[in-house]
């Protein structure tokens, strides 16, 4: 899709928001073929730049083993980073998991 094309262009130039949006498209298969490995790749790029929603989603990838081998400790670390930044979904998820 046109949107995916422009997200990719911006993502490749290091735009964290575009990386996050592109990852979501790969996760859901919106305008691109669904690919959890590519979703993980782009979430990781954005998460390393401090994007709190990407950090949460990267943690969920690790928790569920989607696009990457399951790793609960990595999941906890990324979701905790997101929660520290005040991201509601991460805070709720941590409470639900009893972390």
Question: Predicted regions span which residues?
Answer:
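Short helix-capping/linker turns of helical repeat alpha-solenoids
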Residues: 7, 12-15, 28-30, 35, ...
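Asparagine/serine/threonine-enriched low-complexity, disordered tracts
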Residues: 9-12, 21, 45, 57
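TPR/TPR-like alpha-solenoid signature
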Residues: 20, 41, 56, 76-77, ...
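Hydrophobic face of amphipathic alpha-helices that form TPR/SEL1-like repeat modules
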Residues: 21-28, 57-64, 93-99
């Amino acid at each position: 899709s046109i949107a995916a094309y422009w997200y990719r262009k911006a993502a490749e130039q290091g735009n964290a928001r575009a990386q996050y949006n592109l990852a979501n498209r790969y996760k859901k298969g919106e305008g691109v073929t669904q690919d959890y490995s590519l979703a993980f790749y782009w979430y990781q790029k954005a998460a390393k730049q401090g994007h709190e929603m990407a950090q949460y989603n990267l943690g969920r990838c690790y928790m569920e083993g989607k696009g990457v081998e399951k790793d609960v400790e990595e999941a906890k670390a990324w979701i905790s980073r997101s929660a520290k930044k005040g991201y509601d979904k991460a805070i709720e998820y941590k409470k639900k998991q009893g972390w």
